[in-house]
Amino acid sequence: MRLEDIRPQAGSTRRRRRLGRGVSAGQGASCGKGMRGQKARKGGSTRPGFEGGQTPLYRRLPKLKHFPRYRRRLEYTLVNLRALADLPAGSEVSLESLMERGIVTTNDGPLKILGDGEVSVPLTIRAAAITASAKVKVEAAGGRVEILGS
């Protein structure tokens, strides 16, 4: 076998479109571009955002200075109380302990506890954030909540 003997897999290549080569060729006359108009001419179409010569929206709006271009939202690792219901009494709940137990599989950021579900045993929760409803439910069960970083 030599390099010049190599051929593409059967059916893997498509024939190129031969435009303007007669009506029966399938792409004759107007070459699939319809009838007249700017999009039918050579040189292709207009750029994105072009409004036909009218001042485009991105130039009509004023420049806003002194604003950060991109403000990154803090992403949390979210856990509902429903996932903590089976933990033994007196357990400490933190991102590390939840990952060890397999309740959380990926670290998407600081731990945030959400209030969906019920908890019946006292737990010590160490998290970056907790919703008000979750805090009420944990403290009603005799647990403690410790907010990290404050």
Swiss-Prot record:
One of its GO terms (biological process) is translation. InterPro entries: Ribosomal_uL15, Ribosomal_uL15/eL18, Ribosomal_uL15/eL18_sf, Ribosomal_uL15_bac-type, Ribosomal_uL15_CS. Keywords: Ribonucleoprotein, Ribosomal protein, RNA-binding, rRNA-binding. One of its GO terms (molecular function) is structural constituent of ribosome. Residues 1-57 are annotated as: Disordered. GO terms for cellular component: cytosolic large ribosomal subunit. It comes from the Bacteria. Pfam families: Ribosomal_L27A (PF00828). Residues 23-35 have a biased composition (Gly residues). Binds to the 23S rRNA. Part of the 50S ribosomal subunit. HAMAP family: Ribosomal_uL15. Belongs to the universal ribosomal protein uL15 family. This is Large ribosomal subunit protein uL15.
